[in-house]
Every structure is written in C-alpha cells, then in structure tokens.
C-alpha cells in the first residue's frame, strides 16, 4: 500500500515534528531552500525569505484585510464576507458567460457548452452562499443595518455586468457608477455588445432556423424583448432531441443557466423577506416588491414559454 506523510496528503496541513525539525536544521545553517525542502523525502518547503508564495500569489494579506466591519454585531461579519464572496463569484460567472457568448459567435458550440457548464458550477456555489445568512435574525440585522447607509446590492457593478450579459439592459443602470470611469467603460462595452442569448439566436439563424431578422441584428443596447418567431425557432430545435443535436444541447444548457439565475433571485428575495420584511430597501427601492418583480422576469424567455406548447 502506498503511504504519504500528512503534509503530502494536504498542502494546508502541518508536516509534523519531522518537518519542523528539518526547518530548525535549515535555519541553523545557511537557510538554503534546498535544505528545508528535503526533496529526497518529498517533504514541503518550510523556509522562505518573506511571505510564503501562497500568500503572495493569492494576495491573502490583502484579501483578509477587507473584512472591516463597522459595528460589534457578529452577524455583520457573515453579511460582509458573504457579500464579498458573491462579488468574486460574479467575476467567475461573467468570465464564463462571456467565453460562451464568444464561442457561439465563432460557431464553436462545444466550447460554448463547456463555458456554460463551468458557469453553472460557479452559479451553484453562488446560490449556496445565501445559506451563510440563513440564520441571521431581524434583530441582528437591525444592529448593523444603519452602518452601511445607502449601500445596496442594486449598486453592484459586478452583478450589473451579469444582467447585461443576460440581455436585461438599460443605459440608466450605468449612471450610479459615473464617477468610476473604468467601470463605466466596461459596462458600456457589455451594453453595446450582443448578450449571451443574442449570440445563441444568431447561431440559430446561421444554421437556417427562422429567427426573426430584428432579433439577429438590432440595437444591442436595448433590453431583450421576447418574440413568437424566436419561440418557433426553438420549437424546431426541440423537435430533434437526439444527443447529437448540438443546438438542443445548447438550449438545455441555457436553461440550466436560466434556472440558476431564477433560483438566485428567489433566494435573494427570501433572505430579504426573512431579515427585514417589507421595509424600504437601503438603496431607495421598495425592497421586497422590487425583488419580487425581478424574480418573475424570465431569463431567455422563449425557452420558458416554449414549454407551454411542447
């Protein structure tokens, strides 16, 4: 049976007394990295001249300096960390949606499917993140709510990028970020480009499916509007559900994305309802009512409405 040391089993675990002794011997000598590494045993390097490469590469010191709560309420830490985790996941989802969109524009369906699958895995983690706030009570939330003033998730430009990629576009939604030029530039780029769904419809058109012309070339800065002609085009795709039909696989992959988006919105609604009920939102919206309307807004609408007639 093959055996490994605990340090070999997991890079985050201590290597034990033997590795500690190796580090002591190395520091007593010239401190050479080769001595601490003990390559003949396969042990980890335990001596570094400054911050460890792990801390340096991942920016751990910077990352862990960002959780600056403004009150003594313990629940604020969970709230702040969850918010920051979600922002990081927004970046990952956006990167994969953009990669999938670009692959569709290049007629590379396998690459698009890979990007969408990767995005769904990130979306699952994103949705699970709401569980970190599942036990926060209204009383706990009220103890730190005033500390963030008018701050609101509505102001997240990371989330706004996702909405633009989904086709939910509005130039007015760039306005809150007008003082941040790089953010404005990035949002404008996404506003003016085809969305993920637009790219899918353009692919269907190139494959000879009856996508209406005004959904193949249009003003990309406008929010997507559903069309019966698009539903008919998807109906032709669903008429052939064999595994070899890459357009059918694409349709279902898009539904996987859409379902997770809907779930995230619903989880957001439930979290707000549980912690603050129907009180006005911190960003000026009517809170619960605004979120409820957002939940009802279908992503990739014809893929949903099609199910009424199949």
Feature names for model-found ranges:
Residues 2-310:
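Surface-exposed peri-terminal alpha-helical interaction modules
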């Amino acid at each position: 049976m093959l055996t490994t040391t605990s340090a070999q089993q997991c890079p985050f675990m201590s290597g034990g007394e033997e590795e500690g002794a190796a580090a002591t011997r190395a520091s007593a000598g010239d401190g050479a990295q080769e001595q601490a590494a003990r390559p003949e045993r396969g042990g980890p390097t335990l001596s570094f001249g400054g911050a460890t490469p792990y801390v340096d590469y991942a920016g751990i010191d910077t990352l862990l300096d960002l959780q600056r709560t403004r009150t003594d309420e313990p629940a604020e830490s969970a709230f702040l960390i969850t918010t920051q985790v979600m922002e990081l996941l927004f970046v990952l989802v956006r990167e994969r949606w953009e990669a999938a969109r670009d692959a569709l524009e290049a007629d590379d369906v396998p690459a698009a499917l890979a990007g969408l699958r990767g995005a769904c895995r990130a979306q699952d983690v994103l949705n699970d993140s709401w569980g970190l706030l599942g036990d926060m009570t209204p009383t706990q939330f009220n103890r730190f709510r005033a500390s963030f003033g008018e701050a609101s998730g509505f102001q997240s430009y990371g989330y706004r990028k996702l909405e633009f990629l989904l086709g939910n576009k509005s130039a007015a939604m760039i306005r809150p970020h007008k003082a941040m030029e790089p953010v404005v530039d990035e949002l404008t780029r996404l506003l003016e480009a085809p969305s993920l769904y637009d790219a899918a419809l353009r692919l269907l058109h190139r494959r000879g499916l009856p996508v209406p012309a005004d959904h193949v070339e249009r003003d990309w800065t406008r929010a997507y509007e559903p069309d019966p002609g698009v539903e008919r085009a998807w109906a032709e795709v669903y008429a052939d559900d064999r595994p070899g039909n890459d357009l059918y696989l694409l349709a279902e992959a898009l539904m996987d994305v859409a379902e997770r988006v809907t779930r995230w919105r619903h989880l957001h609604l439930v979290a707000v309802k549980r912690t603050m009920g129907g009180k006005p939102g911190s960003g000026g919206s009517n809170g619960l009512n605004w979120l409820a309307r957002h939940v009802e807004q279908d992503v990739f609408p014809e893929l949903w409405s099609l199910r009424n007639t199949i």
